[in-house]
Amino acid sequence: MCSTYGLLSFEFSDTAAMDPIFFSPTNGIPSESKLATYMNRQNVATPSGYGLNNGFSLLNLDSPLNKKSQVTPQSPEFIPTRLGSTPNFYAPYHNAPMQLSNGLNGVNGLTAAAAAAAAAAAAAAAAVPSSTSSASSASVTISKTANGGASMLALQKTASIASVTIAQQQPQHPQKQQQHPPSVGGGAVSAASAPIAISGAPPNPAAAPFVSSMSAQTPLKGRGAMMRQESPTAAMISGAGPGEKSPPHGMTPHGASPIPSALPTSVHQENVGGTIYFYPTANAQNSQPVVNSMVVDGTHPALHGVSAVAPMSAGVPAAMMYTGHVYPGPSSNVVTMQPKTLLESAFFMPDEMRAEVLARNEISNLIMDAAEAAQHALPLEVENYHALYPLEPPAQPLHAKLTFPATTYRATHNTTGYKYCLRRIHGFRLQSTKCMTLVEMWKKLQHTNVVQLREVFTTKAFGDNSLVLVYDYHPGSQTLLAKYFTPAPETNGYTDPFQGEARPFSHKSNMQRTSNGPLLPEATIWSIIMQLTAGLKAIHHAGLACKVLDPTKIIVTGKRVRFSSCCISDITQFDPNASNPLALVNMHQQDDLTALGRLVLALACRCLQSVQRDNVQSSIDMVTRNYSTDLRNFIVYLFTTNNRRSVTDLMPMIGARFYTQLDALQSKIDMQEDELAKEMENGRLYRILVKLNSINERPDFNLDCTWSETGDRYMLKLFRDYLFHSVTEDGRPWLDHAHIVQCLNKLDAGSIERVQLMSRDEQSVLIVSYAELKNCLENAFSELMSSAAN
């Protein structure tokens, strides 16, 4: 049987194109290898074309290794082409259509237009009937650019110049002629035209228009200086280790994998110089086409009528053109908000945020020791809650209007495992269940400045009749009283004789340096006012009243202010004989506004005694001297009880300060979202480390004690040493976060960049690509998963 092969040769207008390097007789392949035998067959085109010196010549171990260019941490030069993830923890990402090209935006150094034109010319030539023995002719004009790269300047079809020769052999037995599978590009050249190198070596140049090189211009190459993907920390990070400069990365079409997971039976595999080559055998006519070292489904609807080398259309959505899942670096709008500290901030959250989160986690996980448990004598379980932990000393008075002591606990729900705050009212017996109407109204109220009520029940688990109210738990919170009205510790043994309740209000010299600290900035006071009025507005619009608006029942979590202990007064002061429980709600709402004015005045003076009846006028005069007129008018309006007031009337008094508060909140959201994206990448790298450490140094697998030291696993072991155990020239450990993160990202992306791995005895040196390492990692971990499932 004879096969029809199309022989395509380009005639360069520049004599430099005839350099012998383009016609290497051995191509860096040993003559005794099967690959050399295959390429020397008469029915295979002679290797020629641009890019050969960038391919097989790289197998020479004597060639110098270029230093890496500066790369942004967590922003490697290779952008993976996989989009989305499945619920499976170790499941790979899916591919998305990307542009197939190499470093020159084309195929084997040609531009996209030239590649498409060459493919069209070959397709037209292939359409000539097999009975015609004359060769069709076409002219492809290629010129050399200033930098030595070939660019397509013109594509001319003429009948006189036979620059492109298509040799066709007529089969001796037409009735036995085999049907060749159509190529991806629409031409008639079989997939058996050239071997394919998985590590980035170019395929047979004779099939250049039909078999794309596995190298493409990445979106990060040549990008603008102000693009979103640019990281400001790129200038601070040097090269991440030895190795050649990263060549462009190949983009794969939809439905294709950058690493062949299942090769046709007629495709031969050979490892030459650390590079795995795949090429079809003689009976590969009906096999599945192999393009760009990947198995392409010819029946995929995305490939019908689409050329494999066609450029990306301008109509393709941006989400389809850039599908990388590697952290692109911080946003330009949050760079100025991030702390200028160590380089580690490029990988991890700031120390201040980490300390705050860790402190909250530590508070949430506190447990009592034996002495504390004996002192409090808490029950093991209360209704549906267990693991009670006291948040304040026991038997603290709840409020001046209430005579029942109260205690606050943190508890864990038995079913969900969530932590809640339990407020226990000691010795309270519920007289009527009519108050549950108000409880249901409070449970429906949801606001960011109000601690939400979840549940109310009575219990005897504490040894008495107790009322328990269940609220959301906000760890690390403190009351407004503890934050702004707690006396500061005295230094050098000095004690102010006029402090606390014993200090007369006429002691003017101490008003500027109160025992509770210096006066608060006006911006802080307005921030508290806006949050309190927002929560109070939600309460009043729900037809309820707070009733306990004082510093002991307002909590502060970071910079968030919330109303707490809501609904307690509605239960403890409920009149079962009243026909309408909401009849007096308007009066209580007016009391809330007066209490808000007293609280703001106390904050401005930083003293609780400033709101006493005899001291109010002097305190307002002090506010006039130290703060703006708007704050004074705000307080005076709340103290005026002659007219009916509304919380809505307070909004114009706040004025444009609301926009300042909104801008601060949005800036904080931007920074937190950027930190979240950073930590999400850390989780992705963690999954790669889990796979590596599950394979490396495994003592036994299926009764094979040497499983982790042989085969593909040996390369993973050497890669582990290259990743974590590198040393400097003088033998000192080389600890570089950028090196570790960058290599893990390249491994996850399946980069075609090659890395030099050396054994610990320095007797073995392997040069492999990250794509091969990823293939080894996936195969080895799949073996572990299969064995664990069985």
UniProtKB/Swiss-Prot annotation:
It is found in: Cytoplasm, P-body. One of its GO terms (biological process) is nuclear-transcribed mRNA poly(A) tail shortening. ATP binds at residues 423, 472-479, 552-553. Gene3D superfamilies: 1.10.287.3700, 1.20.5.5160, Transferase(Phosphotransferase) domain 1. SUPFAM superfamilies: Protein kinase-like (PK-like) (SSF56112). Keywords: ATP-binding, Coiled coil, Cytoplasm, mRNA processing, Nucleotide-binding. The N-terminal zinc finger binds to poly(A) RNA. Contains a pseudokinase domain. The protein kinase domain is predicted to be catalytically inactive because some of the residues important for catalytic activity are substituted and it lacks the equivalent of the binding site for a peptide substrate. However, it has retained an ATP-binding site and ATP-binding is required for mRNA degradation, stimulating the activity of the PAN2 nuclease in vitro. This is PAN2-PAN3 deadenylation complex subunit PAN3. It comes from Drosophila melanogaster.
